[in-house]
A protein has these predicted regions:
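Compositionally biased intrinsically disordered regions enriched in Thr/Gly
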Residues: 1-123
């Protein structure tokens, strides 16, 4: 069984406020290969969050943004059955009234230990 818990990064850098909510996956499986795959997936998700945070900070300083910036990430569990998960995650940067969003979907099959693509679904 796959358990998905939310982790939160909440901090402030200059006038940038971060509320980065991201998933941490845990699986009740004793197989070492599956556990290693779970760690790879968790590191990949955390890496995406870190990259988003870095991009927001770099953009703020490079473009000399005046005013407050809010950087937010949220995820939803769209599917979690039979060791297959699908979680869309939205990364949003709000500068004044301007909203820039990017949605990325994490789709994994922990039985096959691989990322699922549309080609896998529609064979």
């Amino acid at each position: 069984m796959i358990n998905i818990a939310g982790k939160l990064i909440s901090n402030k850098v200059n006038n940038i406020r971060f509320f980065l909510n991201y998933p941490k996956i845990d699986i009740e499986e004793e197989n070492d290969h599956v556990q290693q795959f779970v760690e790879v997936v968790n590191k990949s998700i955390k890496n995406e969050v870190d990259i988003f945070e870095d991009i927001v900070i770099n953009t703020y300083f490079e473009e000399n943004i005046i005013g407050n910036v809010n950087a937010i990430s949220e995820f939803q569990i769209a599917f979690n059955r039979g060791n297959i998960i699908s979680m869309p995650m939205e990364f949003t940067q709000i500068i004044g009234l301007t909203d820039i969003s990017h949605i990325y979907s994490y789709n994994y099959d922990f039985n096959l230990m691989k990322k699922i693509t549309l080609n896998d679904i529609f064979k």
